[in-house]
């Protein structure tokens, strides 16, 4: 018998990619459908997986100030719509991967007495998952440090943060690059881009190019034109500037050093593929969770952490150049990252979902 599984999340790739990594585990083994925000990027991201998508009229509440009342009203409407979707699709379980988009479907599932599970990617749980943890039948964590936040330990499982199979495959292709002479810098601002990181790199292009550093730069859609113009001033180079990188596995494999934000999925992927990094956490992330995420890689010696408020005082470009000039440190950072990569998370979450469904079937 095929189970019917509803997956719900949205907002950013940091939530959606772990959800899709788990969806990969159920290929041909379950009927899947995806519930997210009709305003987020998730509908497009899910298309390539051929999973039916249902959109809800919800936006985030935190940081919206006077618009929060409107957002809360939309959430109530979304719960009503989510109930109708669940009535139509009749899932055996609803699995949420955080963000405001997951709240309505999981509440609706509880109202309909459908089993639920949630996965938390960050060291510091987001608002939606903190509220939903009381209702969920299972709570999956990316890092054991988060365990103390949840009071009902019997339903909590440490699974790791699911990553895409193409990224997992790179874990086994890891190579010691101490004899390599390449200077490949991968610049990432997350799925939505990062203007601060983009500006740091554009302002430092002259120094980077003079040190023979080749760059692949994901700018985000909204800042692409500006950044592209910055690179164009230097004529033909081997560097690439794109709004979004579709094949992240290939980009990681190409890179020697990564400059990026510190979203939970990025941290998990950096560890899995064994890439040293310079991390500039997004300073306005809820509860500053990106800083807590970054500290994991810093503690094990795999990353350098630079708060965005310090980028004026700290010469980020000089840090990049110094690491490329110190191959021993760069390799040791890569080895430390690779050692702490967890690649079985998607399988663990999938197995826990099956266990929960089996237990409920026996009741």
Swiss-Prot record:
InterPro entries: GlcNAc_MurG, Glyco_trans_28_C, GlycoTrans_28_N. HAMAP family: MurG. Cell wall formation. Catalyzes the transfer of a GlcNAc subunit on undecaprenyl-pyrophosphoryl-MurNAc-pentapeptide (lipid intermediate I) to form undecaprenyl-pyrophosphoryl-MurNAc-(pentapeptide)GlcNAc (lipid intermediate II). Pathway: Cell wall biogenesis; peptidoglycan biosynthesis. It catalyses: di-trans,octa-cis-undecaprenyl diphospho-N-acetyl-alpha-D-muramoyl-L-alanyl-D-glutamyl-meso-2,6-diaminopimeloyl-D-alanyl-D-alanine + UDP-N-acetyl-alpha-D-glucosamine = di-trans,octa-cis-undecaprenyl diphospho-[N-acetyl-alpha-D-glucosaminyl-(1->4)]-N-acetyl-alpha-D-muramoyl-L-alanyl-D-glutamyl-meso-2,6-diaminopimeloyl-D-alanyl-D-alanine + UDP + H(+). UDP-N-acetyl-alpha-D-glucosamine binds at residues 12-14, 122, 164, 191, 245, 290. One of its GO terms (molecular function) is undecaprenyldiphospho-muramoylpentapeptide beta-N-acetylglucosaminyltransferase activity. Signal peptide: none annotated. The lineage of its organism: Bacteria, Pseudomonadati, Thermodesulfobacteriota, Desulfovibrionia, Desulfovibrionales. This is UDP-N-acetylglucosamine--N-acetylmuramyl-(pentapeptide) pyrophosphoryl-undecaprenol N-acetylglucosamine transferase. It is a peripheral membrane protein. It is an enzyme of class 2 (transferase). Its EC number is 2.4.1.227. Pfam families: Glyco_tran_28_C, Glyco_transf_28. The gene is murG. It comes from Lawsonia intracellularis (strain PHE/MN1-00). It is found in: Cell membrane. Belongs to the glycosyltransferase 28 family. MurG subfamily. One of its GO terms (biological process) is carbohydrate metabolic process.
């Amino acid at each position: 018998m095929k189970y019917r599984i509803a997956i719900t999340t949205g907002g950013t790739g940091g939530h959606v990619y772990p959800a899709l990594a788990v969806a990969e585990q159920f290929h041909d083994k379950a009927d899947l459908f995806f519930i997210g925000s009709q305003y987020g990027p998730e509908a497009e991201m899910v298309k390539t997986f051929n999973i039916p998508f249902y959109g809800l009229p919800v936006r985030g509440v935190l940081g919206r100030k006077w618009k929060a009342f409107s957002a809360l009203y939309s959430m109530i409407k979304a719960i009503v719509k989510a109930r109708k979707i669940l009535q139509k699709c009749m899932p055996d379980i609803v699995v949420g991967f955080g963000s405001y988009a997951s709240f309505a479907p999981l509440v609706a599932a509880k109202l309909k007495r459908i089993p639920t599970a949630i996965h938390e990617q960050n060291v510091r749980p987001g608002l939606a998952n903190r509220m939903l943890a009381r209702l969920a039948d299972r709570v999956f964590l990316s890092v054991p440090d988060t365990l103390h936040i949840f009071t009902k330990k019997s339903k909590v499982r440490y699974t790791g943060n699911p990553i895409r199979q193409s990224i997992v495959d790179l874990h086994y292709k890891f190579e010691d690059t101490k004899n390599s002479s390449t200077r490949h810098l991968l610049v990432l601002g997350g799925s939505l881009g990062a203007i601060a990181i983009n500006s740091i790199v554009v302002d430092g292009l002259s120094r980077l190019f003079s040190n023979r550093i080749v760059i692949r730069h994901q700018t985000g859609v909204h800042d692409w034109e500006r950044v592209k113009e910055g690179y164009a001033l230097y004529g033909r180079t081997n560097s690439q500037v794109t709004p979004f990188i579709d094949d992240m596995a290939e980009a990681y494999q190409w890179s020697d050093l990564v400059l990026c934000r510190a979203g939970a999925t990025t941290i998990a992927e950096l560890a899995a593929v064994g890439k040293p990094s310079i991390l500039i956490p997004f300073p306005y992330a809820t509860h500053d969770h990106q800083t807590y995420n970054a500290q994991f890689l810093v503690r094990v010696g795999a990353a350098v952490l630079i708060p965005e408020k310090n980028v004026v005082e700290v010469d980020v470009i000089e840090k990049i150049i110094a690491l490329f000039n110190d191959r021993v440190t760069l390799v040791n950072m890569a080895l430390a990252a690779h050692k702490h990569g967890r690649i079985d998370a998607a399988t663990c979450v999938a197995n826990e979902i099956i266990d929960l469904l089996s237990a409920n079937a026996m009741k």
